[in-house]
Amino acid sequence: MSSKRSIFEEVSDGARAAAAQPGMIDRGRGGARGAIRAWLAVLFALVVAMIVVGGLTRLTDSGLSITEWRPVTGAIPPLSEADWQAEFDKYKQIDQWRLQNQWMELADFKSIYWWEWGHRQLGRVIGLVWALGFFGFLLARKIPAGWTGRLILPGVLGGVQGAVGAWMVASGITQGEGMTSVASYRLATHLGLAFVILGLLAWSILQLGRSERDLMQARRTKEARLFGLATGWLHLAFLQILIGALVAGLDAGRNYVDWPLMAGQVIPPDPLELSPLWRNFFENPGLVQFIHRIVGYLLLAYGVMVWLRGRRSAHAQTRFAFNAGFAALSLQVVLGIVTVLYAAPWQIAILHQLLAVGVFVLILRARFLCAYPIATSIRG
């Protein structure tokens, strides 16, 4: 008995047309997108925690308490009083103790040691979480097509970050050179790379939150001009973060505690006192804080322009993303002024650094939604 036919089906003696074959996107190995996204979200949270702990390590002047770089054996802290005394004796050999911390007893040293040890230990945890996740998904063949390289990159950069951290600490482990902290250039490099890793993780998390088909379709409605503006906004925010790291490295946030002027002047006193001239832009605390303020004003002004343009987007979620990014930036500007007026106490300073993470990620999300808009339903 022949099968039933639809009343709209064309009648013929020929064989029925073969079912449509899936396209390249449909045939691609989907992998475990949800599980990988969750794993990257854990890494993202750990990197944010690392930035906060790193900031607290700097604010408590703890970064030079461990004078040796032992990536493996350093995971074990001192276990006996003799071990603690040996570590303290090593610390007593560097300039920070001789010039700044001779008042310290062993109990005081333990306090700063634990901060630095915790910071390094968290780095080891991040490396372990990345390795277990990546190789687990790789062996299970659950990585989506085209994603292997993208998932390797955070791990490679994490390894580089560990080396940069050692390089940074080495700049402050001096004897007779007068260094009592790490070099501000190296601190800025260390923090900048942390934000690069954070940005890569955030972008991947956003991509994995949608299917390849959805992303491919969304690219057809990319808001190219707005994407370019958001890219500039993101880069300017990143530059401001690097300058903020220079301010932190020089402890420049406590030098001038008035606003909007600096010591009653528009430009701080002696802005070009160092020689050669270029050093002032990186090593003069007054000029570096002045530059941080000026770039902050530029970032806000540019943000107003981008926000007004973003509000005209045809996509509701894109508009919301720009509203969120601008709101966070406005709050960050206010918090920056408060940080100056209160001479950068550690509680406000660390909140200022954490909010910088929020501003950076929210601007990045707005940029992502320009590249991959989410269509708004006609029904609203």
Swiss-Prot record:
One of its GO terms (cellular component) is plasma membrane. It is found in: Cell membrane. The keyword Coiled coil does not apply. PANTHER family: CYTOCHROME C OXIDASE ASSEMBLY PROTEIN COX15 (PTHR23289), CYTOCHROME C OXIDASE ASSEMBLY PROTEIN COX15 HOMOLOG (PTHR23289:SF2). Catalyzes the conversion of heme O to heme A by two successive hydroxylations of the methyl group at C8. The first hydroxylation forms heme I, the second hydroxylation results in an unstable dihydroxymethyl group, which spontaneously dehydrates, resulting in the formyl group of heme A. NCBIfam families: HemSynCtaAAlphapr. This is Heme A synthase. It comes from Ruegeria pomeroyi (strain ATCC 700808 / DSM 15171 / DSS-3). The gene is ctaA.
